[in-house]
């Protein structure tokens, strides 16, 4: 993170002409288990990672917000918080920031303007929530600068609202919530219905290894929407608000009445919810053998029932599983049709996992992977006062 801090400080001073007063960060995240459960009112188990979005900031006495984006060549966006805050077609990055500020104002928070320089190293397009980290770090920045009475959960909800309503992208609450509330050496069990969170301790030295297949994700939006509709149809047939409310026993009694495809989709969600709750118990007990079994079952369910994995992802999972055996777990993470796998790996095996994948994956698929070795880290907060 030290490079990021240096970059935002330097760009702040160069572009805005004086020194910032505060450094604030918010992390990206990876979901260890609980896939496609969020919009079914279910459970997820993400952790925050040591890839962050970092801000250098200072408050202004007037109503102007000026933002410098280090990652877009020190491009500047400027707006007045007393005027209508509008969507910028030609500056997509700026809309996340504008949306967060607009939503904070709509929620009744009072503050003046600010100068902000922002940079991040959360890989974009890898499904590690670079956009949520940006939304959360901006909310956190206004909290810090103006001592706002806002909870971490509300910073997360405000970021989700900005993405849904201002940016115009539908997302659940998981990404913002873990970025806002993460804890070092812990995952977070999130109930997507009640928004209750529970910190779940992880074995301290465990590495969280994320491997991007770099398989271009085709069809992902249309297939995602289809899966969502199939889940909603199943919930209607069971007469419940969401599949969260269906037990596997109820499912088995009624399975013959369901369309075969809808049945497979519903079975994934129902069993995945149970797995996620059990995974939190296994992780807390530091039972990596059971955690590994649950992650393997999750992957098989995504592959066979939800049908969202691809050959490249299945290949990566098998390669990693051969190395870690019962000492950790591995599965696809994210929306599917490409993207990343996540593995919980004992430190002694990290190099072997990397070496195996580097030696075999490209030969098997023709694609070159990207490997990120992470730890579970703290959520958003103040890094330093300058």
From Swiss-Prot:
Gene Ontology MF annotations: ATP binding; galactokinase activity; magnesium ion binding
EC number of this enzyme: 2.7.1.6
Active site: 175 (proton acceptor)
GO CC, alphabetical: cytosol
Major location (coarse): cytoplasm
Chain positions recorded as ATP binding sites: 69, 125-131
Residues involved in substrate binding: 35-38, 224
InterPro entries in UniProt: Galactokinase (IPR000705), Galactokinase_bac (IPR022963), Galactokinase_CS (IPR019741), GalKase_N (IPR019539), GHMP_kinase_C_dom (IPR013750), GHMP_kinase_C_sf (IPR036554), GHMP_kinase_N_dom (IPR006204), GHMP_knse_ATP-bd_CS (IPR006203)
Catalytic activity: alpha-D-galactose + ATP = alpha-D-galactose 1-phosphate + ADP + H(+)
Similarity annotation: Belongs to the GHMP kinase family. GalK subfamily.
Name assigned to this protein: Galactokinase
Organism: Vibrio campbellii (strain ATCC BAA-1116)
Lineage: Bacteria, Pseudomonadati, Pseudomonadota, Gammaproteobacteria, Vibrionales
Gene (name only): galK
């Amino acid at each position: 993170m030290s490079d990021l801090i240096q970059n935002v400080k330097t760009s702040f001073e160069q572009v805005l002409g004086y020194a910032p007063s505060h450094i604030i960060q918010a992390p990206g995240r990876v979901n260890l288990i609980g896939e496609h459960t969020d919009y079914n009112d279910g459970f997820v188990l993400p952790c925050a990672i040591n890839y962050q979005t970092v801000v250098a900031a200072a408050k202004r006495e007037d109503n102007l917000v000026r933002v410098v984006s280090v990652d877009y060549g020190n491009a500047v966006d400027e707006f007045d918080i007393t005027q209508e805050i509008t969507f910028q077609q030609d500056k997509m990055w700026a809309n996340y920031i504008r949306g967060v500020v607009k939503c904070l104002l709509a929620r009744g928070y009072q503050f003046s303007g600010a100068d902000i320089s922002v940079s991040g190293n959360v890989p974009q397009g890898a499904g590690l929530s670079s956009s949520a980290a940006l939304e959360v770090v901006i909310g956190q920045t206004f909290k810090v600068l103006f001592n706002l009475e806002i909870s971490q959960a509300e910073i997360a909800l405000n970021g989700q609202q900005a993405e849904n309503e201002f940016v115009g992208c539908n997302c659940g609450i998981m990404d913002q919530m873990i970025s806002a509330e993460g804890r070092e050496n812990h995952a977070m069990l999130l109930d997507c219905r009640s928004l209750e969170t529970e910190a779940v301790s992880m074995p301290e030295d465990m590495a969280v290894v994320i491997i991007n297949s770099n398989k271009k994700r085709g069809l992902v939006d249309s297939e995602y929407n289809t899966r969502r509709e199939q889940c909603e149809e199943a919930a209607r047939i069971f007469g419940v608000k969401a599949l969260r409310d269906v037990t596997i026993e109820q499912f088995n009694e009624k399975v013959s009445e369901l369309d075969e495809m809808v049945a497979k989709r519903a079975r994934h969600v129902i069993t995945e919810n149970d797995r996620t709750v059990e995974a939190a118990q296994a992780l807390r007990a530091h039972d990596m053998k059971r955690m590994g079994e649950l992650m393997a079952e999750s992957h098989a369910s995504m592959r066979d029932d939800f049908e969202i994995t691809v050959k490249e992802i299945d290949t990566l999972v098998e390669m990693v599983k051969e190395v870690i055996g019962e000492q950790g777990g591995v599965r696809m993470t994210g929306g599917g049709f490409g993207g990343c796998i996540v593995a919980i790996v004992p430190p002694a095996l990290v190099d072997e996992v990397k070496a195996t994948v580097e030696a075999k994956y490209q030969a098997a698929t023709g694609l070159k992977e990207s490997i990120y070795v992470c730890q579970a880290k703290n959520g958003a907060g103040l890094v330093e006062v300058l």
